[in-house]
Amino acid sequence: MKKIFIFSGLGADKRVFSKLNLKEFEVVHIEWLPSIKNENLSNYVNRLAEYYQIPASGANVLGISFGGMCIVELAKTYDFNKIVLISTAISSSNLPSYHKIFRYFPIYKLFPSQLIVTPTRIHHFLFGVTDAVDRKLLNAIIRDSNSGFFRWALYSILNWDSLEIPKKFLHLHGDKDRIIPIINCNSVRRIAGGGHLMILTHHNEISILIKEYLNE
Protein backbone atom coordinates (compact mmCIF):
# COMPACT_ATOMS: atom_id res chain seq x y z
CA MET A 1 0.00 0.00 0.00
CA LYS A 2 1.41 3.36 -1.05
CA LYS A 3 1.91 5.94 1.70
CA ILE A 4 1.00 9.59 1.24
CA PHE A 5 1.72 12.48 3.61
CA ILE A 6 -1.06 15.06 3.65
CA PHE A 7 -0.74 18.72 4.69
CA SER A 8 -3.88 20.73 5.50
CA GLY A 9 -4.41 24.47 5.03
CA LEU A 10 -3.97 27.51 7.24
CA GLY A 11 -6.09 27.15 10.35
CA ALA A 12 -7.40 23.82 9.08
CA ASP A 13 -6.85 20.19 10.00
CA LYS A 14 -7.45 16.72 8.58
CA ARG A 15 -11.22 17.22 8.62
CA VAL A 16 -10.99 19.10 5.30
CA PHE A 17 -9.99 15.78 3.72
CA SER A 18 -12.89 13.84 5.25
CA LYS A 19 -14.71 13.42 1.92
CA LEU A 20 -11.73 12.31 -0.15
CA ASN A 21 -11.67 8.66 -1.16
CA LEU A 22 -8.09 7.56 -0.59
CA LYS A 23 -8.83 4.17 0.94
CA GLU A 24 -6.25 2.39 -1.18
CA PHE A 25 -3.44 4.50 0.30
CA GLU A 26 -1.83 4.68 3.73
CA VAL A 27 -2.57 8.27 4.70
CA VAL A 28 -0.42 10.16 7.18
CA HIS A 29 -1.99 13.46 8.22
CA ILE A 30 0.56 16.15 9.07
CA GLU A 31 -0.75 18.24 11.95
CA TRP A 32 0.73 21.66 12.57
CA LEU A 33 3.37 21.99 15.25
CA PRO A 34 3.55 25.20 17.28
CA SER A 35 5.77 27.74 15.55
CA ILE A 36 8.88 29.11 17.23
CA LYS A 37 9.24 32.87 17.65
CA ASN A 38 10.73 34.48 14.51
CA GLU A 39 10.90 31.10 12.76
CA ASN A 40 10.84 31.34 8.97
CA LEU A 41 8.79 29.05 6.75
CA SER A 42 11.75 27.03 5.48
CA ASN A 43 12.95 26.16 8.98
CA TYR A 44 9.42 25.36 10.10
CA VAL A 45 8.60 22.93 7.29
CA ASN A 46 11.91 21.12 7.66
CA ARG A 47 11.28 20.74 11.38
CA LEU A 48 7.79 19.46 10.58
CA ALA A 49 9.17 16.92 8.08
CA GLU A 50 11.71 15.65 10.58
CA TYR A 51 9.05 15.31 13.27
CA TYR A 52 6.83 13.18 11.02
CA GLN A 53 9.82 11.31 9.56
CA ILE A 54 9.04 12.14 5.95
CA PRO A 55 11.71 10.43 3.81
CA ALA A 56 14.11 12.80 2.08
CA SER A 57 13.59 10.84 -1.13
CA GLY A 58 10.69 8.94 -2.70
CA ALA A 59 7.74 10.13 -0.59
CA ASN A 60 4.28 10.98 -1.93
CA VAL A 61 2.86 14.25 -0.60
CA LEU A 62 -0.38 16.21 -0.91
CA GLY A 63 -1.10 19.70 0.31
CA ILE A 64 -3.99 22.13 0.20
CA SER A 65 -3.59 25.91 0.36
CA PHE A 66 -0.91 26.78 2.96
CA GLY A 67 -0.03 23.08 3.13
CA GLY A 68 0.77 23.16 -0.57
CA MET A 69 3.16 26.07 -0.07
CA CYS A 70 4.86 24.10 2.70
CA ILE A 71 5.38 21.22 0.26
CA VAL A 72 6.82 23.58 -2.36
CA GLU A 73 9.34 24.76 0.26
CA LEU A 74 10.23 21.19 1.21
CA ALA A 75 10.64 20.20 -2.44
CA LYS A 76 13.66 22.50 -2.62
CA THR A 77 15.62 19.99 -0.53
CA TYR A 78 13.42 16.84 -0.60
CA ASP A 79 13.20 14.58 -3.66
CA PHE A 80 9.52 13.63 -3.64
CA ASN A 81 8.07 10.86 -5.80
CA LYS A 82 4.64 12.40 -6.41
CA ILE A 83 3.40 15.86 -5.43
CA VAL A 84 -0.28 16.83 -5.39
CA LEU A 85 -1.05 20.52 -4.85
CA ILE A 86 -4.64 21.68 -4.36
CA SER A 87 -6.01 25.24 -4.16
CA THR A 88 -2.55 26.65 -3.55
CA ALA A 89 0.27 28.76 -4.94
CA ILE A 90 3.34 27.04 -6.32
CA SER A 91 5.31 30.28 -6.24
CA SER A 92 4.86 33.71 -4.70
CA SER A 93 3.94 35.04 -8.15
CA ASN A 94 0.67 33.07 -7.91
CA LEU A 95 -0.49 35.07 -4.91
CA PRO A 96 -2.89 37.96 -5.57
CA SER A 97 -1.40 41.45 -5.66
CA TYR A 98 -3.41 42.67 -2.67
CA HIS A 99 -1.24 40.45 -0.47
CA LYS A 100 1.47 43.09 -0.83
CA ILE A 101 -0.78 45.59 0.92
CA PHE A 102 -1.04 43.36 3.99
CA ARG A 103 2.70 42.70 3.86
CA TYR A 104 3.48 46.38 4.33
CA PHE A 105 0.39 47.21 6.39
CA PRO A 106 -0.08 44.12 8.61
CA ILE A 107 -3.40 45.11 10.11
CA TYR A 108 -4.18 41.42 10.72
CA LYS A 109 -1.85 41.63 13.73
CA LEU A 110 -4.42 43.88 15.38
CA PHE A 111 -7.25 41.38 15.02
CA PRO A 112 -8.38 40.06 18.42
CA SER A 113 -8.04 36.31 18.84
CA GLN A 114 -11.80 35.91 19.21
CA LEU A 115 -12.35 37.44 15.79
CA ILE A 116 -9.93 35.00 14.14
CA VAL A 117 -11.78 31.96 15.50
CA THR A 118 -15.30 33.24 14.83
CA PRO A 119 -16.85 31.92 11.58
CA THR A 120 -18.97 34.29 9.49
CA ARG A 121 -20.80 34.32 6.18
CA ILE A 122 -17.75 36.03 4.73
CA HIS A 123 -15.79 32.84 5.34
CA HIS A 124 -18.46 30.82 3.52
CA PHE A 125 -18.25 33.19 0.56
CA LEU A 126 -14.44 33.30 0.40
CA PHE A 127 -14.06 29.53 0.71
CA GLY A 128 -16.88 28.83 -1.73
CA VAL A 129 -19.03 26.58 0.45
CA THR A 130 -22.81 26.68 0.05
CA ASP A 131 -23.90 23.28 1.34
CA ALA A 132 -25.15 23.33 4.95
CA VAL A 133 -23.02 20.33 5.94
CA ASP A 134 -19.86 21.85 4.46
CA ARG A 135 -20.58 25.17 6.16
CA LYS A 136 -21.00 23.43 9.50
CA LEU A 137 -17.66 21.67 9.05
CA LEU A 138 -15.90 24.89 8.04
CA ASN A 139 -17.39 26.67 11.06
CA ALA A 140 -16.08 23.95 13.38
CA ILE A 141 -12.60 24.09 11.85
CA ILE A 142 -12.43 27.88 12.23
CA ARG A 143 -13.57 27.71 15.87
CA ASP A 144 -10.84 25.16 16.60
CA SER A 145 -8.10 27.26 14.97
CA ASN A 146 -5.11 28.45 16.96
CA SER A 147 -5.03 32.24 16.61
CA GLY A 148 -1.30 32.44 17.39
CA PHE A 149 -0.38 29.93 14.70
CA PHE A 150 -2.80 31.64 12.30
CA ARG A 151 -0.98 34.96 12.69
CA TRP A 152 2.44 33.35 12.20
CA ALA A 153 1.31 31.37 9.14
CA LEU A 154 -0.40 34.39 7.59
CA TYR A 155 2.78 36.41 8.08
CA SER A 156 4.74 33.58 6.42
CA ILE A 157 2.40 33.56 3.42
CA LEU A 158 2.42 37.33 2.97
CA ASN A 159 6.22 37.41 3.16
CA TRP A 160 6.80 34.28 1.06
CA ASP A 161 9.27 35.09 -1.69
CA SER A 162 9.82 31.99 -3.79
CA LEU A 163 9.93 31.47 -7.55
CA GLU A 164 11.49 27.98 -7.52
CA ILE A 165 8.88 25.33 -8.34
CA PRO A 166 9.00 21.52 -8.13
CA LYS A 167 10.04 19.64 -11.28
CA LYS A 168 6.94 17.44 -11.36
CA PHE A 169 3.56 17.82 -9.71
CA LEU A 170 -0.20 17.74 -10.15
CA HIS A 171 -1.80 21.11 -9.40
CA LEU A 172 -5.59 21.11 -9.06
CA HIS A 173 -7.23 24.53 -8.86
CA GLY A 174 -10.81 25.72 -8.97
CA ASP A 175 -11.82 28.39 -11.45
CA LYS A 176 -13.97 30.03 -8.75
CA ASP A 177 -11.25 30.26 -6.09
CA ARG A 178 -11.62 33.65 -4.39
CA ILE A 179 -8.60 33.36 -2.10
CA ILE A 180 -5.97 32.37 -4.69
CA PRO A 181 -7.58 33.25 -8.04
CA ILE A 182 -6.74 30.83 -10.84
CA ILE A 183 -5.90 33.74 -13.15
CA ASN A 184 -2.56 34.01 -11.34
CA CYS A 185 -1.74 30.31 -11.68
CA ASN A 186 -0.06 28.38 -14.50
CA SER A 187 0.32 24.64 -15.11
CA VAL A 188 -2.94 23.80 -13.35
CA ARG A 189 -5.66 21.23 -13.88
CA ARG A 190 -8.75 23.42 -13.82
CA ILE A 191 -11.72 22.24 -11.73
CA ALA A 192 -14.89 23.85 -13.08
CA GLY A 193 -16.90 25.61 -10.39
CA GLY A 194 -14.37 24.80 -7.69
CA GLY A 195 -13.72 27.30 -4.89
CA HIS A 196 -10.92 27.34 -2.34
CA LEU A 197 -12.48 24.43 -0.45
CA MET A 198 -13.32 22.38 -3.53
CA ILE A 199 -11.72 19.45 -1.73
CA LEU A 200 -15.09 19.29 0.06
CA THR A 201 -17.45 20.48 -2.66
CA HIS A 202 -15.83 18.58 -5.58
CA HIS A 203 -14.40 15.64 -3.65
CA ASN A 204 -15.47 12.92 -6.10
CA GLU A 205 -13.75 14.52 -9.09
CA ILE A 206 -10.66 15.37 -7.07
CA SER A 207 -10.41 11.87 -5.56
CA ILE A 208 -10.38 10.33 -9.03
CA LEU A 209 -7.69 12.71 -10.31
CA ILE A 210 -5.48 12.12 -7.27
CA LYS A 211 -5.72 8.34 -7.55
CA GLU A 212 -5.01 8.38 -11.27
CA TYR A 213 -1.91 10.49 -10.73
CA LEU A 214 -0.56 8.48 -7.80
CA ASN A 215 -1.08 5.20 -9.66
CA GLU A 216 0.62 6.30 -12.88
Protein language model features and the residues they cover:
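Conserved alpha/beta-hydrolase catalytic His-Asp/Glu region
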Residues: 115-161
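Gly/Ala-rich beta-loop-alpha elbow adjacent to hydrolase catalytic centers
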Residues: 62-71
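Flexible "cap/lid" loop of the alpha/beta hydrolase fold
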Residues: 79-112
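Histidine-bearing beta->alpha loop at or near hydrolase active sites
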Residues: 33-35, 176, 192-197
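Active-site signature of alpha/beta-hydrolase-fold catalytic machinery across serine-
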Residues: 19, 73-77
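Short beta-strand/loop motif that positions the catalytic acidic residue
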Residues: 171-173, 177
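Catalytic histidine-centered segment of alpha/beta-hydrolase-like enzymes
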Residues: 39, 194-209
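Active-site catalytic motif of lipid deacylating hydrolases and related acyltransferases
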Residues: 1-57, 107-113
